[in-house]
């Protein structure tokens, strides 16, 4: 038995300089696990609750001492003496102790920190890498990265409405080559933007945040950068968008303020369809707002056969929301963010449900990240084949890419890079 003898949380800072929770778990054998919890900027209304202090005299109210206290008090008392290898038992005990449907009492940031740190300690106890401990012997698929190289929306101080413009190096033979290709395009894009007189400051996720007039202009710059780096757009590298459309959905309309457009759901679907005709876009995340089920139905009918339609705010990594989407036949992919649901067990349940229904899944970071690279291991553990973890700058993003490179090296000849086969179209 891998007995839990100590759990300790502290308040640390994330990549935006905001407080977050870090948790240490110690087992009786001396095995140890540590996990830091990420935080989002564009958060879905149906996400599990991130507990903040609200004390305006500390961190402008964003402190997490209440969550830290929950870990060091109630959660430690409840879990002390339990077997760290029984992940389901641990996670259910915390869910029951919290007693709310969205983890609002103790905080998803408190519960998730403990959940992930327990898994890491158990992996060390078993003398297994985390991806192997979570996923078992069949964990061997390295994910295609979605690299966010132009930032807009809530992730940047510019007029671009669409939040993320991403590249996916699908022709790479390995994940190490995919990272190299992404870095080459990133630097080519920097030169293209600079030559055109744009700033090359970066946003929250490490992508550039130039003052461009439209999504079309951003995509045109990216295609030029792909070509300048020596690759073919649509063959070597395909494009992906995260519209984060809940952020510009107002009174039943999609208000693209940067482009001066106000569209209904049908107009928004036509907007995406036109972009997909002009550019090799094979994935669109949150193309419609989180509760615009009718809009999602239109989008799925129009583009679902040839484009991956990813539900982030729509599903919030919640098996109940995902089950509703599957019943209604909307979207065809789920974005997986561990802090949206708040435990490792529920995260894995959502991925399994998606795969059984024929949906793809994409492991994802948040805009507020740390050096913690756990999601890289979870991506390999679940064989999900795709990961979203930012651009090719900022060490909080690169920590995940570097971990994937290490995992690929460790797996050796059994490692398989997912490549283009993971996508529709």
Curated annotation (Swiss-Prot):
The active site is at residues 205, 337. SMART domains: Enolase_C, Enolase_N. Gene3D superfamilies: Enolase-like C-terminal domain, Enolase-like, N-terminal domain. InterPro entries: Enolase, Enolase-like_C_sf, Enolase-like_N, Enolase_C, Enolase_CS, Enolase_N. Keywords: Cytoplasm, Glycolysis, Lyase, Magnesium, Metal-binding, Secreted. It catalyses: (2R)-2-phosphoglycerate = phosphoenolpyruvate + H2O. Pathway: Carbohydrate degradation; glycolysis; pyruvate from D-glyceraldehyde 3-phosphate: step 4/5. One of its GO terms (cellular component) is phosphopyruvate hydratase complex. GO terms for molecular function: magnesium ion binding; phosphopyruvate hydratase activity. GO terms for biological process: glycolytic process. Binds a second Mg(2+) ion via substrate during catalysis. It is found in: Cytoplasm; Secreted; Cell surface. (2R)-2-phosphoglycerate binds at residues 163, 337, 366-367, 388. Its EC number is 4.2.1.11. It comes from the Bacteria. Mg(2+) binds at residues 242, 285, 312. Its cofactor is Mg(2+). It holds the Pfam family Enolase_N. Catalyzes the reversible conversion of 2-phosphoglycerate (2-PG) into phosphoenolpyruvate (PEP). It is essential for the degradation of carbohydrates via glycolysis. Belongs to the enolase family. This is Enolase. The gene is eno.
């Amino acid at each position: 038995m891998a007995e839990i003898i100590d759990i300790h949380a502290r308040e640390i800072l994330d990549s935006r300089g905001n407080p977050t929770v870090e948790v240490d778990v110690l087992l009786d054998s001396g095995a140890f696990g540590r996990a830091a919890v990420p935080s989002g900027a564009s958060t879905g209304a149906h996400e599990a609750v991130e507990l903040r202090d609200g004390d305006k005299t500390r961190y402008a109210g964003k402190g997490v001492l209440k969550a830290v206290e929950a870990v060091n008090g109630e959660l430690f008392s409840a879990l002390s003496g339990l077997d760290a290898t029984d992940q389901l038992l641990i996670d259910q005990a915390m869910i029951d102790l919290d007693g709310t449907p969205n983890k609002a009492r103790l905080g998803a940031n408190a519960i998730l920190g403990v959940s992930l740190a327990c898994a890491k300690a158990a992996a060390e106890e078993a003398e297994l890498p985390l991806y192997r401990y979570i996923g078992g012997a069949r964990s061997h698929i390295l994910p295609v990265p979605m690299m966010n190289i132009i930032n807009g929306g809530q992730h940047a101080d510019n007029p671009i409405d669409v939040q993320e413009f991403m590249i996916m190096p699908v022709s790479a033979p390995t994940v190490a080559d995919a990272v190299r290709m992404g870095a080459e395009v990133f630097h080519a894009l920097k030169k293209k933007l600079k030559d055109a007189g744009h700033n090359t400051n970066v946003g929250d996720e490490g992508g550039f945040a130039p003052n461009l007039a439209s999504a079309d202009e951003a995509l045109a710059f990216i295609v030029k950068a792909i070509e300048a780096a020596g690759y073919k757009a649509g063959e070597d590298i395909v494009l992906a968008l995260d519209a984060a459309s809940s952020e510009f959905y107002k009174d039943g309309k999609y208000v693209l303020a940067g482009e001066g457009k106000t569209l209904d759901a049908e107009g928004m679907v036509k907007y995406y369809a036109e972009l997909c005709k002009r550019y090799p876009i094979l994935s669109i995340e949150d193309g419609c707002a989180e509760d615009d089920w009718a809009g999602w139905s239109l989008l799925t009918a129009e583009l679902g056969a040839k484009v991956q339609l990813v539900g982030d705010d729509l599903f919030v990594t919640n098996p109940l929301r995902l089950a509703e989407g599957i019943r209604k036949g909307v979207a065809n992919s789920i974005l997986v963010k561990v802090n949206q649901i708040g435990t490792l067990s529920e995260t894995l349940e959502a991925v399994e449900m998606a795969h059984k229904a024929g949906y793809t899944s994409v492991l994802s970071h948040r805009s507020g990240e740390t050096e913690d690279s756990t999601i890289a291991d979870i991506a390999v553990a679940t064989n999900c084949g795709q990961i979203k973890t930012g651009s090719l700058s900022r060490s909080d993003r690169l920590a995940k890419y570097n971990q994937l490179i290490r995992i690929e090296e460790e797996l050796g000849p059994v490692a398989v890079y997912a490549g283009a086969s993971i996508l529709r179209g």
